[in-house]
Amino acid sequence: AINAKYIHSNLAVYCLKAYAEKNMPQDVNVQIELAEYTINQNRDEILKDIYRRQAEMICFSCYIWNLDYVESMIRDVKKVMKDVIIWAGGPEVSYDSRETLGRLPELTGVMKGEGEKTFAKLCKVYGKSSETSELSLEQIDGITFRCPDGTICERPWRVPMDLSEVPFVYHDMKKFENKIIYYETSRGCPFSCSYCLSSVDKTLRFRDTGIVKRELKFFTDS
């Protein structure tokens, strides 16, 4: 995640990690690390930290405030880590995934829309296990990806998930000290503002009220 300011945090990447870890078969060999930076950081400093981690797959979260920065970073990462698998997700790449892949030959694929279930499936593909040995990218909804022959393959959008299935991510508040906390009680929007990508998703969903009350109490008690 490359945030706009130091005080910001990226709720999306925390949700993806939490959901994937909760739903991962025991014999899938995947270790998920989060890395948050800001658009104000030195680019070489970020590139150095990414390289130091030596990840086999890197996923970037793309928004209107960081898209140019992220695209440039993707190009740089691929120069120094030629074999790394790179995926992108977020609202700024979801609705023009084919164009994004055409613009960025360094990308392996794009996750479209909400990413919890999609990211978990990708982890299972790349971390093969006895349960998922037959799973392939061609079977995963919610992605557009580059096939081995260079063609671009687009899968259908994923059916919106039950928001109550997303794990609560704020168990350790120390890592969010002096930062803004983002909490999600709903997804989708009933309005049609022309300037906002949220208007594209007409499926308005809410997190279970009982769960919301318990989680908000956690914040007030902390």
Q: Where does each model-flagged region fall?
A:
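Conserved SAM/AdoMet-binding glycine-rich loop
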Residues: A1, M57, D83, W87, ...
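A short, flexible N-terminal coil/short beta segment enriched in small residues
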Residues: A1-K22
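Radical SAM [4Fe-4S] cluster-binding motif and immediate context
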Residues: H8, S164-S222
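Active-site phosphate/pyrophosphate- and oxyanion-stabilizing loops and adjacent acidic/basic residues
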Residues: Y14, A18, R75, R98, ...
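Alpha-helical packing segments of well-folded alpha/beta enzyme cores
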Residues: L16, I46, M73, V212-F219
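Glycine-rich beta-alpha loop elements in corrinoid/cobalamin-binding modules
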Residues: Y19, E33-W157
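Signal peptide-proximal N-terminal region
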Residues: A20-V30
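A short, sequence-level motif marking secondary-structure junctions
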Residues: W157-L163
